[in-house]
Design a protein with these regions (language model features):
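Pre-Walker A (Motif I) flank of P-loop NTPase domains
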Residues: 2-7, 70-71
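Conserved beta-strand scaffold positions in the cores of enzyme catalytic domains, especially
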Residues: 30-32, 105-107, 151-155
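Glycine-rich phosphate-binding loop used to anchor ATP phosphates in small-molecule kinases
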Residues: 51-105
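Active-site flanking loop/helix segments enriched in acidic
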Residues: 168-197, 218, 222-232
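Divalent metal-dependent catalytic cores for phosphoryl transfer on phosphate-bearing substrates
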Residues: 196-306
Length: 307
């Protein structure tokens, strides 16, 4: 059976994703298929967002043509949704199997702090509105192996990004006076994180993840509900996704970058037990794996106990 390398870029607009795609194209001897390039080619406007259905139909078709011709290829788009990543990965694997071709799937996660994405975006010829970057940031799913990847590559365009948010202890100290303004929390944000961490002391990666599991709250804090109505309590919609992305830039000290990705994944899922309640363990053990679910539940129990 022949083997074809398929690479999917994952990153926010302005993260340096397309520049990275060119680098990996040389490394893997692969063709790059970019959603922005297709928009420019077909609609003469790389910023066009009115024909996404047509753009991605063309992109997917070209990926499959490369696979059928046994060519390595790179999918260059933001690809922020884990569900869509998984669905397309299954789709091309099924397609390749009909051609007696095996897919070696790699995910390139371009790790750039959102504030740099916004800054770099302003330097581009084709700029993405800042509110679009903000929306994508709040909906970003950090990639992980349960999606079906053979390998995930963490690509930091600037080496210093790896620990530019400092240590978990520094975040806790800086938020000891952060009033959460929510009836579910009697403690400040820093106090809550410290108390939750005490509940999982000695748990290694789980302890690290617990110490910053709510780090996305300051960014997401709003006194408006989902209808846009002003409320007396503060809401933190999507803080688990923002927090998971932020974890990639904390100093993980003795942990490797891929262990840090695991911690980010724990933060990504730590709210799910609240949403799924008694169905969480059974449903998500099949979806993301038993070990990951058990570690998420450790954070959940610590989170509840620290309210």
């Amino acid at each position: 059976m022949k083997i074809c390398t398929f690479v999917m870029m994952v990153g926010l607009p302005g993260s340096g994703k397309s520049t990275a795609a060119k680098y990996f194209a040389k490394l893997y001897e692969a063709n790059v298929h970019s959603s922005d390039d297709i928009r420019e080619e077909i609609f003469n406007n790389a910023e066009d967002q009115n024909h996404n259905k047509e753009v991605f139909e063309i992109l997917h078709k070209r990926i499959k043509e490369d696979i059928e011709n046994e060519k390595n290829c790179i999918y260059d788009a933001t690809n922020i949704s884990y569900k869509r990543r998984m669905a397309f990965l299954r789709e091309i694997r099924d397609f390749a199997a009909t051609k007696d071709i095996k897919i070696h799937a790699r995910c390139i996660f371009v790790c750039t702090p959102v504030e740099y994405c916004i800054r770099w975006n302003k330097l581009r010829d084709c700029q993405v509105p800042e509110e679009v970057i903000d929306r994508m940031y709040r909906n970003f799913d950090v990639p992980y192996y349960y999606e079906g990847w053979n390998k995930i590559v963490l690509y930091y365009p600037i080496r210093a990004f790896r620990n530019c948010y400092g240590k978990a202890d520094e975040f806790i100290l800086n938020h000891l006076d952060f009033n959460q303004n929510n009836k579910h929390h009697s403690l400040t944000l820093g106090g809550h994180l410290e108390k939750a961490r005490e509940r999982v002391c000695g748990e290694g990666l789980v302890s690290f993840a617990t110490s910053i599991h709510d780090c996305g709250k300051p960014y997401c804090a709003t006194f408006k509900n989902t209808k846009g109505e002003i409320t007396e309590v503060c809401h933190y919609y999507s803080h688990e996704k923002v927090g998971a992305y932020m974890v990639m830039f904390f100093d993980a000290e003795t942990f490797s970058e891929f262990e840090k990705l695991y911690a980010a994944t724990l933060v990504r899922w730590h709210m799910q037990p609240y949403f799924s309640k008694e169905n969480f363990e059974n449903k998500y053990s099949r979806k993301i794996g038993k070990d990951l679910v058990q570690d998420v539940l450790k954070i959940h129990r610590a989170d509840v106990a620290a309210h």
